[in-house]
């Protein structure tokens, strides 16, 4: 009878499958993403929205130095969750790929083509010895011609297009909110509110200065970073809405108790 090798014997090399068909190093890389900051992406009728809770852990940190949303090209932007150093490497590579496409073909790269190139790089690091998978997920979004695109990539190199999605530690909660409240006909303004609402449910206190947000509208097709002043107004509006929801829930509960 063949002796089974313990799981620990399969998690030391990226190129070895376990008897159950698992690549443990890829699963560990996904765990790094699950511990990362929460990012939300939403496709709207007139553009796309990305929002990230930067999760500042110390008041001594200069908030402006923590970047979670990166412009790749004029019309493409990406949000990251996971290992910051890994994100920097892939973002730099994505920017190079975007410029190479412009030089080679005389036109901007599409969101889908860029997402696939990044996934090719990620996938290559799952079957080469002497390297480890990238411990991060990316939300890559932008405008292709006249349509919004939103892609999620994970450490294995898998690529999925979404209407709305979330990555990071708050993904389960954020996805529940998005599935309940997302509407394909919502505007970018409404999408920004929904993104902030989803982020607010993943943390005890959501501070405007800790939020990184960007949009791309289908009119100008250019990436636009949202200022803290604008985010403050959205956060206030969202918390006012949450307050009303809580009051209505309490009234409903009180009525049910009386009955």
From Swiss-Prot:
Q: Which HAMAP family match?
A: Proteasome_A_A
Enumerate the SUPFAM superfamilies for this protein: N-terminal nucleophile aminohydrolases (Ntn hydrolases)
Entry keyword Cytoplasm = yes
- Where would you say this protein principally sits, based on its record? cytoplasm
Question: Which molecular function GO terms apply here?
Answer: threonine-type endopeptidase activity
State whether keyword Cytoplasm applies: yes
InterPro entries assigned: Ntn_hydrolases_N, Proteasome_alpha, Proteasome_alpha-type, Proteasome_asu_arc, Proteasome_asu_N, Proteasome_sua/b
Q: What is this protein called?
A: Proteasome subunit alpha
An example Gene Ontology biological process: proteasomal protein catabolic process
Q: Gene for this protein?
A: psmA
Activity regulation: the record says:
The formation of the proteasomal ATPase PAN-20S proteasome complex, via the docking of the C-termini of PAN into the intersubunit pockets in the alpha-rings, triggers opening of the gate for substrate entry. Interconversion between the open-gate and close-gate conformations leads to a dynamic regulation of the 20S proteasome proteolysis activity.
Stated role: Component of the proteasome core, a large protease complex with broad specificity involved in protein degradation.
Task: Give a Gene Ontology cellular component term annotated to this protein.
Answer: proteasome core complex, alpha-subunit complex
Q: Which PANTHER family match?
A: PROTEASOME SUBUNIT ALPHA/BETA
Q: Which CDD domains match?
A: proteasome_alpha_archeal
Q: Which family does it belong to?
A: Belongs to the peptidase T1A family.
Q: NCBIfam families, from UniProt?
A: arc_protsome_A, PRK03996.1
Keyword annotations:
Cytoplasm, Proteasome
């Amino acid at each position: 009878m063949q002796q089974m090798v313990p799981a620990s014997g399969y998690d030391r090399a990226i190129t070895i499958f376990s008897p159950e068909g698992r690549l443990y190093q890829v699963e560990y890389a996904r765990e790094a993403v699950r511990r990362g900051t929460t990012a939300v992406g939403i496709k709207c009728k007139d553009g796309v929205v990305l929002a990230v809770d930067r999760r500042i852990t110390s008041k001594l940190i200069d908030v402006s130095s923590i970047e979670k949303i990166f412009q790749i090209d004029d019309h493409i932007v990406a949000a990251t969750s996971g290992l910051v150093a890994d994100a920097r490497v892939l973002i730099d590579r994505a920017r190079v790929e975007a410029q190479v496409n412009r030089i080679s073909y005389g036109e901007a790269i599409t969101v889908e083509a860029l997402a696939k190139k990044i996934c090719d790089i990620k996938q290559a690091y799952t079957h080469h010895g002497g390297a480890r998978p990238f411990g991060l997920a990316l939300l890559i979004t932008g405008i292709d011609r006249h349509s919004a695109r939103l892609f999620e990539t994970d450490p294995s190199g898998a690529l999925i297009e979404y209407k709305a999605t979330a990555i990071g530690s708050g993904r389960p909660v954020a996805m529940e909110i998005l599935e309940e409240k997302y509407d394909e006909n919502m505007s970018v303004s409404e999408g920004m509110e929904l993104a902030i609402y989803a982020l607010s449910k993943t943390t005890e206190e959501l501070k405007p200065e800790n939020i990184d947000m960007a949009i791309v509208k289908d009119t100008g097709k250019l990436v636009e970073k949202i200022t803290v002043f604008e985010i403050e107004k959205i956060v206030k509006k969202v918390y006012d809405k949450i307050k009303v929801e809580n009051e209505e829930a309490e009234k409903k509960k009180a009525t049910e108790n009386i009955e």
